[in-house]
Amino acid sequence: MLGVFSALEVAASGLSAERVRMNTIASNLANVRTTRTPEGGPYRRIDPVFEAVGLDQLQGFPQLQRGVSLVRVSRVVEDKRPGTMVYEPGHPDANADGYVEYPNVNAVEEMVNMITASRAYEAGITSIDTVKQMAHSALEIGR
């Protein structure tokens, strides 16, 4: 059986993962027109990769049922899709043919991702509120 604190831990892990996703989306949107980075070349879109970690695998949770998982960000990866080439011969980052490579960030796609992450975060908050209400109700019954 999943206890109150374990349920809160699961929900909190989801909130933390969505916060990382929102931060990467913000970085992508902030760099949508960055044609030169310190590493050289245009900014490359980044994406977090999530993994499920079973609570039964974590130290201190041996009594929990299998199948309950925390969410963790295992890594942040760079999107390998090519950027957009735009003919701008006067641009300082133009190549010999006059083309500038812009980041592989699609602002509309990022906005959709932001809405999805925001809704997932809201769902996590709702689950925490529900767990708190259940714990409160259980305490009231015990009185």
Regions found by a protein language model. Give the residues of each.
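Amphipathic alpha-helical polymerization modules
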Residues: 1-143
